[in-house]
Amino acid sequence: RGLGDVYKRQVHAYETMNKECDIELCASMGFLNAEQLHRLHEAGVTSYHHNIETSRRNFPNICTTHTYDMKIETLKLVKAEGMWACSGGIIGMGEDWEDRLDMAISLAEVGVDSIPLNALMPIKGTPLENERRLTEPEILRTIAFFRYINPEADIRLGAGRALLTGDGIKAFQSGASATITGNMLTTVACATIRSDKNMLKEIGRETK
């Protein structure tokens, strides 16, 4: 699916950032074809984010505008291009333990390099407002078997850290290896960068 002028402007933005900033570039632009991904790669993008959101069985309950296979095919194109594939989803959206296991296996089969795991924070007025909040043991168990099934991938904590004690310190002891920090990308703010660095230093983890 072509993105026309919007896509061209985004490619230009990545080219500029690649020249002027000493950072790794990760794009999140939805469904792209092989040619578009190659152009992004040439522009300096080394990682592509494309969440599968949930299990194949539960996906139609969450999304009706596209299919699970479309998600998987995009990730395969990312890997074929030689870019890092970043894909995960949200737990607590009505799925059961088998769904979470299937999701972890789907990501392993594609060979994703980074897995952002979010825990749903039910918010009034949204379609999933009545979903039960996950307990900390449930979240930690999920992280642990995602780590077991995807031993080489980065497991990244995303939304839902407010459901964990101690800013999520036990999550890192359960298999998480990275986190989204600050209040820029989640509806409910995460911990601050400073507090996260202090927490990671406390358990002997390195930060940049």
Give the label of every model feature segment.
Residues 8-41, 47, 52-56, 91-99:
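Canonical radical SAM enzyme core domain
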Residues 9-19, 35-42, 70-80, 102-109, ...:
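Alpha-helical scaffolding segments of alpha/beta enzyme cores, especially the outer helices
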Residues 24-30, 49-51, 86-90, 116-118, ...:
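A cross-family glycoside hydrolase active-site/sugar-binding cleft signature
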Residues 8-9, 63-70, 95-102, 130-138:
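Alpha-helix N-cap and loop-to-helix initiation/capping positions
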Residues 33-40, 94-106, 162-174:
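Catalytic cores of alpha/beta
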Residues 5, 57-62, 124-129:
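A short acidic, helix-capping loop that chelates divalent metal ions and anchors anionic groups
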Residues 1-7:
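Short, small-residue-biased leader/transition segments that mark boundaries at the very start
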Residues 19-21, 108-208:
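Auxiliary Fe-S-binding modules of radical SAM enzymes
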